[in-house]
């Protein structure tokens, strides 16, 4: 599987709303496989299709916390609870981190690679990863939500 080029801040695809996947084809599955390979190669915990230049609503996530690899097509957050603040970074914004407020718990629904609807209740780091990757599908980068860089308010 080829490792895909990760698009960096400034690339217009990162600021565009991704299009829903209307049919899961061999090409879709190949893209997912290549995204997974790219995420692991880059030592990331999540990757959205726009980050590899494809304007489709697909994310892959593996936080390394034991839940394993999660692949979602057309994911959406259907419920949130609580709030917390945590430092984030992004493969598309290399060398930058910042504190971002996000929901501490989320319920996400989407399709798995077989086209079956799944719902995942997540909290902590996994909830944060889902929110971060789904933001990418809406043209939003974590830097748009940063509340603190270092100790200075922005």
Curated annotation (Swiss-Prot):
Pfam family, one: Pep_deformylase
Active site (catalytic residues): 133
Cofactor note: Binds 1 Fe(2+) ion.
Source taxon at top rank: Bacteria
Top EC class for this record: hydrolase
Leader sequence segment: none
Keyword Iron: yes
Known cofactor(s): Fe(2+)
Gene Ontology biological-process annotations: co-translational protein modification; translation
Protein EC: 3.5.1.88
Name of the molecule in the record: Peptide deformylase
Gene that specifies this protein: def
